[in-house]
Amino acid sequence: MQQVLENLTELPSSTGAEEIDLIFLKGIMENPIVKSLAKAHERLEDSKLEAVSDNNLELVNEILEDITPLINVDENVAELVGILKEPHFQSLLEAHDIVASKCYDSPPSSPEMNNSSINNQLLPVDAIRILGIHKRAGEPLGVTFRVENNDLVIARILHGGMIDRQGLLHVGDIIKEVNGHEVGNNPKELQELLKNISGSVTLKILPSYRDTITPQQVFVKCHFDYNPYNDNLIPCKEAGLKFSKGEILQIVNREDPNWWQASHVKEGGSAGLIPSQFLEEKRKAFVRRDWDNSGPFCGTISSKKKKKMMYLTTRNAEFDRHEIQIYEEVAKMPPFQRKTLVLIGAQGVGRRSLKNRFIVLNPTRFGTTVPFTSRKPREDEKDGQAYKFVSRSEMEADIKAGKYLEHGEYEGNLYGTKIDSILEVVQTGRTCILDVNPQALKVLRTSEFMPYVVFIAAPELETLRAMHKAVVDAGITTKLLTDSDLKKTVDESARIQRAYNHYFDLIIINDNLDKAFEKLQTAIEKLRMEPQWVPISWVY
């Protein structure tokens, strides 16, 4: 308005304008009310703000790479690095870049829009959605695709990934265009395209309108090693999650019967794909065919032989060897003292020595059971000290009633550990230490006994031979073992570890009794100070 007023004043008479009209117009424009209206209009006028840049986070990370080596040279640089690495500052930049890269205006209609397959589906106008996302080159979106009715459909969204955090896409959404170009129907090509794009990405989608399901808090302990890059069945190797035996994972999605989504509890980070219980059991249970080529067709046509085996209690260990363990559901518990400490190992690896040392050093905290026997007591033996003496008929009746954890016969007499004797020690507030046969773990691994299972592994044959020679020379034992006996111990130790590894909370190689005792003592103390992951059945 000020510019118009100045022009009116300087307007030459040659324009033909009447002077009275100019005076009238000038009077209106100088009126205070009109000036106020003009100022209000300027204030309310919508002026579009343009972002200077939509990749500030990427620029800041590049700056950090350049100046981080100088933090020890200049205090100001160190302070700046600290500010730029602040989580709040990084989140602010990320939020700015996301907002700056979004398209708030109506997007221009693409050339394909008029004749595309979208129109052929006779969908309502409001079914088509245009979304804008911002990403860096090489940054995974955390999403996989599948072909459905010749369309590319979102098969799964990885928990914790970029798409999951933004919440803009959902499972079942159909991807029609990326940056104005139709995507076709090849999932791998789309994955590569999205992986290499940087900056602003505009997606045209047909929403699925499915209800989102809140993920359950499910945690599992893994009983096998897994590397997605060695898996030929996984739909996208880059989306897989690598883990090792014994790690704890959080399962965040189990909708797919073959592929679950999980994340590391200890390391955190985005979720990845892991084989489901069903899929991995099928893989582990698969056995190559045994063919019988003894028929009359000289091997040109053959029939499959099926191995039949009836379950026998005497062959319990053989069936344990073929038991398939994949995942075990667990729960996190605050620190607590376990009811039992179970030492598993081959004969002669030092379990009894470790047990006796714990009880002698701390009898108020640790105890053990007194075994039962059907043999007659000797003259110097008292009932309840080394053994509890009962009649054979009574012991056989209790064994039949399932009152014994384990039992055996030696030189015509029965020996065994009664379940009630374990509970008697626990009821005194002490941890009951047991050195039992590994088959007993099936009974012990319950909330009633809450065991901490430690496998005492045999060392290498040379080390075991040297240890045995040392105890014989010191006069600790008079029993001489041959190389065959020692090798049998090593082989038995390896067999037990293969068959029962999934039960073990800790493995200690006993190549030095003092060091093995220290390791075991440290592990038991940790149980009283640190949270523990235990089977879910112990909690619920």
UniProtKB/Swiss-Prot annotation:
Q: Where is the Guanylate kinase-like domain?
A: 338-525
Keywords annotated in UniProt: Membrane, Phosphoprotein, Repeat, SH3 domain
Claim: Membrane is one of the keywords in the record: yes
**Record-linked Gene3D superfamilies:** 2.30.42.10, L27 domain (1.10.287.650), P-loop containing nucleotide triphosphate hydrolases (3.40.50.300), SH3 Domains (2.30.30.40)
Compartments it resides in: Membrane
List, for all copies, the residue spans of the domain called PDZ. 130-209
Its record classes its membrane topology as: Peripheral membrane protein
The L27 domain sits at 1-48, 49-107
* Primary localization: membrane
Entry keyword annotation includes Iron-sulfur: no
Tissue expression remark? Abundant in testis, brain, and kidney with lower levels detectable in other tissues.
Every SH3 domain range? 215-284
- One Pfam family here: SH3_2
Biological processes annotated in GO: protein-containing complex assembly
Q: Name one GO cellular component term.
A: cell-cell junction
- Which InterPro entries does the UniProt record give? GK/Ca_channel_bsu, Guanylate_kin-like_dom, Guanylate_kinase_CS, L27_C, L27_dom, L27_dom_sf, MAGUK, MPP6_SH3
Residue list for modification Phosphotyrosine: 500
- SUPFAM superfamilies, sorted: L27 domain, P-loop containing nucleoside triphosphate hydrolases, PDZ domain-like, SH3-domain
Task: Summarize the subunit comment.
Answer: Interacts with CADM1. Interacts with the LIN7 proteins.
Q: Which family does it belong to?
A: Belongs to the MAGUK family.
Protein name as it appears in the record:
Protein PALS2
